[in-house]
Amino acid sequence: MVTMYFFTLSFGTVASGIMVISALNPVHSVFWLVVAFISSAALFILLGVDFIALMFIIIYVGAIAILFLFVIMMLNLTDFTPAFRRGGEADMTNYVPIGLAVGTLFFEAIASSWLIMGGPYVYRGLLGAWDLANPWFLKKYHNIEAIGRILYTDCYYLFILVSFILLVAMLGAIVLTQEIGTEIGPTAKKQDIFVQTSRAQV
């Protein structure tokens, strides 16, 4: 029964992810993104990691997806040409190498995960991985404490890398708001709510 639930939720997550990038309406894309987040949270609950599942629902569904929805509602999408509708001219072949590179990276990660988790024991010993069939770190500690121990001991470099990525994203947002030629002005350091919410050109 658990296996059936796992495959059902996995299929739902993958299908929702496909619908996110294939839906023509941006609001529908956000809806399918919320479905993908909820399916992923259900998978974590099924695995017994309830803390990450709750964080998925609170942060991704309650904050990020709603933020995407507000951004889509504030954008004037009628200014963009409907590239994927009938008669639209869109050449997406330039993105094929990027898609292949990202797909290869994901498949390599999946293969590495199989060697660590489900592969022969000799590979697990060579890679220095845990025997996840007997998750001692989830049995000895609460899952929040186990995640903290793993995050700040063995995966500390990933934590530092994420902090640098967030710093770059923050600096990029500041640079984008100082874009020259915008309606607010090239050197504006304040918000003009009327200009931001107005659909007409000022």
From Swiss-Prot:
Entry keyword Transmembrane: yes
Reactions it catalyzes: a ubiquinone + NADH + 5 H(+)(in) = a ubiquinol + NAD(+) + 4 H(+)(out)
Matches recorded under InterPro entries: NADH_UbQ/plastoQ_OxRdtase_su6, Nuo/plastoQ_OxRdtase_6_NuoJ
Membrane topology recorded in Swiss-Prot or TrEMBL: Multi-pass membrane protein
UniProt EC number: 7.1.1.2
Major location (coarse): mitochondrion
Gene Ontology cellular-component annotations: mitochondrial membrane
Protein name: NADH-ubiquinone oxidoreductase chain 6
Native source species: Metridium senile (Brown sea anemone)
Chain's gene name: ND6
